[in-house]
């Protein structure tokens, strides 16, 4: 019975205590796509189905502020947020709530693949692929330190400019969400 009682997070009332927790691969924004970030209609179908089956709160997987490929900021994709708005209208019709999890990025926790490691270690290849995937930006951390999953790769310290860009991106993206 307690599962079906409403509760609040701040001033947001959740209709019941059934929560779909975040899982890898469940972001609404396809942020690891070679074609660039976009609204993930397949993930949206999954969430809408859960909302229609009485889940009170849905928390999708992370939404990095910046595309892994091509380096475009989320807030620079108005079409994606138009699709998100339409989707949120459908979610709200069920009485459910959905919270978007914005993240600055991965930093030292970024999963280094067998392909990315050598690209990053070699200054020439790193420079060549930078327009497609800026490994130094993806690995940027609060201080210079080893990558979590590839300790032989040293993550660069974030610059003040990067910090200001991330703060601005949080504000602009949150406003659109």
Mark where each language-model region is.
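N-terminal capping/small domains of soluble enzymes
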Residues: 1-114, 155, 166, 174
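Non-globular sequence segments
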Residues: 92, 97, 103-176
């Amino acid at each position: 019975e307690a599962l079906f009682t409403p509760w609040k997070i701040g001033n947001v009332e959740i209709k019941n205590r059934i929560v779909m927790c975040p899982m890898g691969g469940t972001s609404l924004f396809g942020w690891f796509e070679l074609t660039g970030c976009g609204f993930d209609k397949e993930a949206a179908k999954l969430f809408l189905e859960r909302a229609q089956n009485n889940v009170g709160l849905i928390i999708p997987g992370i939404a990095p502020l910046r595309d892994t490929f091509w380096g475009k900021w989320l807030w620079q994709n108005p079409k994606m947020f138009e699709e998100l708005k339409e989707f949120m209208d459908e979610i709200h019709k069920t009485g459910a709530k959905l919270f978007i999890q914005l993240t600055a990025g991965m930093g030292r926790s970024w999963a280094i693949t067998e392909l990315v490691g050598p690209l990053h270690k070699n200054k020439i290849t790193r420079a060549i692929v930078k327009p497609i995937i800026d490994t130094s930006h993806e690995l940027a951390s609060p201080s210079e330190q080893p990558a979590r999953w590839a300790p032989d790769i040293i993550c660069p310290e974030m610059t003040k400019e990067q910090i200001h860009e991330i703060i601005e991106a949080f504000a602009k993206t949150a406003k659109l969400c």
